[in-house]
């Protein structure tokens, strides 16, 4: 069974969002809304006890007490491959995957409470039993909540790109995060990543190329003129954030590539679209803005 500490430290609502740090380290999110209304409120009150993992907190409202361990076999009532999605949003991807893969179990990790409520609504409407949700800070989930080598796949789709240079330290995928991801994954487990920003795609590729714990499953593929990065650089579609006209009175935010004709991506390493990743409303907005989607797939050595 899961181990629950006797007396978790009190929660400090909003502390992580306010200061942007936890345990002296930057966090990758801002909690923009936690209030529930209507269907979301009703779903949370009626079903959260069953579908939401009630973790003991540590020092903040999304922290996980370091003594707590998630026992997937006890929670799901069986031993099955566990897939974890970090930043599950409204739950479209994880719920679809759970429906298509009844032989696997899924854990949706999110800090946006309305998104988790939406996920619970979808779980109930489809009669699924192989999905759970947890409101928690992702690095803590991977570092201490999940047992070492317990995750068969890790998904991070469209993380916040944190465009401004002074905010790059808040990007989720950093060397330290790669280390805790490797700790949670089984040997040979997959880490699937998608982003609609070329600058973040390059950042991810650099971080994981520098990791000795992962190998790129598509090393050298889709390079040169076939690279989506080359296409973005040469088109100049990301000359300002959004690839669209800047609103009146607002300054453009550079993504560090102003195009056109900036060069050719000779490194490549981009994966084909993962069949299990459905096109969500969030991704649709990226396409409408003219941005390209970058997929990367790594395997734990």
Curated annotation (Swiss-Prot):
Coiled coil: none annotated. Its EC number is 2.1.1.33. The keyword Membrane does not apply. Transmembrane segments: none annotated. SUPFAM superfamilies: S-adenosyl-L-methionine-dependent methyltransferases. Keywords: Methyltransferase, S-adenosyl-L-methionine, Transferase, tRNA processing. Substrate binds at residues 164, 196, 280-283. One of its GO terms (molecular function) is tRNA (guanine(46)-N7)-methyltransferase activity. It catalyses: guanosine(46) in tRNA + S-adenosyl-L-methionine = N(7)-methylguanosine(46) in tRNA + S-adenosyl-L-homocysteine. It comes from the Bacteria. Pathway: tRNA modification; N(7)-methylguanine-tRNA biosynthesis. S-adenosyl-L-methionine binds at residues 85, 110, 137, 160. The active site is at 160. It is an enzyme of class 2 (transferase). GO terms for cellular component: tRNA methyltransferase complex. The keyword Methyltransferase applies. It holds the Pfam family Methyltransf_4. Residues 1-26, 244-270 are annotated as: Disordered. Catalyzes the formation of N(7)-methylguanine at position 46 (m7G46) in tRNA. Belongs to the class I-like SAM-binding methyltransferase superfamily. TrmB family. This is tRNA (guanine-N(7)-)-methyltransferase. It comes from Paenarthrobacter aurescens (strain TC1). The lineage of its organism: Bacteria, Bacillati, Actinomycetota, Actinomycetes, Micrococcales.
